[in-house]
Amino acid sequence: MTEERILDMARRLTQVHGVSGREYPAAAAAAELLAPMGQVEISPLGSVCCTVCPGAPDAPHIVLEAHLDQIGLIVTHLEENGFLRVANVGGFDRRLLPAAPVTIHTENGDFPGVIASVPPHLASDEDREKPPKIEDLLIDTGCSTETARQRFAPGDLITLDG
């Protein structure tokens, strides 16, 4: 396998979203990449198993195990002016979240957003010294209230870009 092919596979696997609990897009991408190498199965819980070049029954087996899921956010409420209230799906280093670009995955497609928090000049001295709580963060979609209500819904998943 060439270095270019390995990089293409890595790009494909890292560009597909698979937030914890809804990993199917990542599992499907992994299964597609593994299919030319052997017999692939996706379990009901989303695990991908590939038997590569099955040999003699007494031949040694090797297991390559990796997580397919990623941490993310989930929309809990639509606020006014196109802002989305969120909860975390998995653990985040909250210090890294303010101003981070995100992608909101919806039934209507994927849309960009950015994580917003209380600006430093409006925060109390105490709040300025600690990372914001997840429940205090919003996703700025850049949409009007009406457009946001057409595009987004509670339960939509959000992934961090990059």
Label each residue range with its predicted role.
Residues 1-162:
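N-terminal hydrophobic/helix-forming segments and targeting peptides
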